[in-house]
Structures are given as C-alpha cells and as structure tokens.
C-alpha cells in the first residue's frame, strides 16, 4: 500500500504511475494499492500485476462541495498459488455510496445490493455505479468484474 496521489483528482498522477511501475517490476510485489485521493481512481495492470490507484472514501466525511467524494469502491482480490508463486486469481469491485450526515448516521451503501432491493435513491445509486465503473475501467483494466 502506498499513500500517494493528488487529493480529489480521479486520474493517477505521474508519481503514482512511476511508483506503480517500479513496485510491480519487483518479483516480491504481487499487487499495488494506493490511497490518498479521496475519490475513486482507475485500476490497471502494470507489468502484469494489478494496481488499484484509489478506492475513494469509506470513512471520511468530505465536504459536499468536493465532487465525487461520496463515491467509493470496496476491492475484493483473491490470490492463489501457481508454480509456487502467489498469483491473482480474482479481482472484483463493489461500488459504494457514502451517505451524507444530513441523512442521519453516515452509512456506506453497497450500490448494487440497494438497487436490487429497491432501497435508496435509484437515480443517485445508478449515477454512482455508472461513475465508479467508468473510472475503475478508464485505463482499460482487464480481468476485473463488478460485484
């Protein structure tokens, strides 16, 4: 994990990309996860390894004036052993919406589960899912599925 990136910027910075490239070049690194931007950032494959540039917010309550800070992603990755080495066997993301304090206690809403159950604002949940999915996949990552 690396605390890196520009706050509130959805695109990874040059420094994030350079760090991910250096780290994934090592045989000792199986995946890179960056955090700091407070917004969802893309997922990518770098040197054949998964890089998660940013998951957004899950606990912080950012000002509503900061775009996209009420969206997040829960990442689920599974590793197996292949030829005696760790190998990524599954990567999934769960789009989430972080509720506002004006709605009562701050809650994390799993977007697809709430859409399936009919709870919450459909328009807001659909927009969150659309935006999160577009951002996660914006660098063309393959082998990652939405849950």
Labelled PLM ranges:
Residues 1-9:
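Short acidic, glycine-rich surface-loop motifs adjacent to enzyme active sites
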Residues 3-4, 38, 56-58, 94-96:
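Active-site beta-loop-alpha junctions enriched in small/polar residues
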Residues 12-75:
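Conserved beta-sheet core of the metallophosphoesterase superfamily
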Residues 67-147:
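A short C-terminal boundary segment appended to hydrolase-like catalytic domains
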């Amino acid at each position: 994990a690396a605390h890196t990136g520009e706050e509130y910027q959805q695109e990874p910075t040059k420094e994030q990309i350079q760090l991910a490239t250096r780290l994934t070049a090592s045989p000792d690194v199986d995946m890179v996860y960056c955090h700091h931007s407070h917004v969802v950032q893309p997922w990518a494959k770098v040197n054949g390894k998964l890089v998660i540039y940013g998951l957004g917010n899950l606990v912080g309550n950012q000002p509503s004036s900061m775009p996209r800070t009420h969206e997040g992603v829960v990442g689920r990755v599974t590793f197996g052993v292949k030829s005696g080495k760790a190998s990524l066997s599954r990567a999934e993301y769960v789009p989430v919406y972080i509720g506002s304090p004006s709605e009562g206690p701050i809650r994390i809403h799993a977007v697809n589960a709430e859409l399936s159950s009919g709870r919450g604002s459909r328009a807001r949940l659909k927009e969150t899912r659309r935006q999160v999915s577009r951002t996660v996949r914006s660098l063309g990552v393959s082998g990652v599925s939405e849950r």
